[in-house]
């Protein structure tokens, strides 16, 4: 069954969210951004994933059995396990604004790109202009420059 409802909608009605992949963590990131305790199961074995900066055994698990065992311990503990499902160590790297306006920012950025192409500008000029405008509106620290060789 599929739905057009965002994953965070289900997350908001849950005590803890579980995400079964590291290869596609967007649903987990959405839930963690909302402050919902979110667990990750690394079924594929991706030790180089950014997610391994999160505490193993509290947020990231190598298999479902370990995650479910920890989840049961968390629910049995009167105050839960401290730091369980807590992404606060890295969540700011995924959305430094945390204001719910990411769609507006990316939409504006894409609009600037489209405007540049409609004007017939060179790709590099379009990209540089959009980056400069984004910097001016939302901060230079939010723009990453990757120079091609």
Question: What kind of feature is each model-predicted range?
Answer:
Residues 65, 69-149:
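C-terminal amphipathic helix plus adjacent low-complexity
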